[in-house]
């Protein structure tokens, strides 16, 4: 490839949710993310929502599923925390579908657990070691 690309960052990743209001409540109300955008499009028939951890540079777009597309996936999204024990305990106490235990495989893999939102989309939470 001879042309130089102008890619600067990963700005957002997208997940789908049939019930976007419920997804918004989960990501903002339960996970504590901030709402970055909530706009109608397609002549008001569809809605584009973006949420992110406070101060984070990458947002999660919560989009309606495309016709015939999956409604729940393993998103591949990895969220960092500074206290995995506390977050695992708090999410479990809040009734969030989390792995029963924190996985600890040792160096270089950070401690981690997975959670699933109301739609079944899975995300991974890690506590980086560095």
Regions found by a protein language model. Give the residues of each.
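Helix N-cap motif at beta-to-alpha junctions
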Residues: 19-20, 82-85
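Short glycine/serine/proline-enriched coil/turn segments at secondary-structure junctions
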Residues: 42-43, 68-71, 107
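Short, charged/polar, Gly/Pro-enriched secondary-structure boundary elements
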Residues: 55-60, 120-123
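Short, charged/polar surface micro-motifs in flexible loops or helix N-caps
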Residues: 54-58, 68-70, 84-86
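Short amphipathic alpha-helices within nucleic acid-binding modules
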Residues: 26, 85-90
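Core segments of cupin and vicinal oxygen chelate
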Residues: 14-57
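Vicinal oxygen chelate
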Residues: 1-6, 12-15, 39, 47, ...
């Amino acid at each position: 490839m001879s042309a130089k690309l102008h890619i600067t960052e990963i700005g957002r990743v997208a997940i789908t949710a049939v019930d976007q209001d419920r997804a918004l409540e989960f990501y903002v109300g339960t996970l504590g993310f901030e709402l970055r955008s909530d706009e109608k499009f397609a002549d008001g028939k569809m809605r584009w929502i973006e949420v992110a951890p406070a101060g984070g540079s990458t947002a999660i777009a919560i989009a309606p599923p495309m016709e015939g597309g999956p409604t729940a996936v393993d998103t591949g999204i990895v969220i960092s925390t500074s206290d995995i024990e506390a977050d695992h305990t708090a999410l479990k106490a809040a009734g969030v579908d989390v792995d029963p235990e924190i996985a600890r495989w040792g160096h270089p893999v950070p401690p981690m657990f997975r959670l699933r939102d109301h739609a079944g989309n899975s995300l991974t939470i890690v506590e980086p070691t560095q």
